[in-house]
Amino acid sequence: MNKIILIGRLTKDVELRYTQVTNTAVASFTLAVDRKFTKSDNEKQTDFFNVIAWNKLAENISKYLSKGKQVAISGRLETRSWNDEAGQKHNTIEIIAEEASFI
């Protein structure tokens, strides 16, 4: 099973675009999620996750969320690879949102 649930805040406004061929909505944003524990100096630790949403969910997220807003995201992890202009291969792990709860 590939399932992840995160609650965090958007680090910047949602980027909404539409694919060229099928005109499908795609939203992308970064979610800052605080860890439950702190460092020894009581400083909070935060993880940052790249999140992608598709179709109507993408449009709703773009409409109702902006920088600093809190959201709960349920989805799956997905790996993606690409080559840059210099031919260097890159890999990334993204969260593919399946549900969003606006908090």
Segments from the language model and where they lie:
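Single-stranded nucleic acid-binding surfaces, predominantly the OB-fold ssDNA-binding core
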Residues: M1-I103
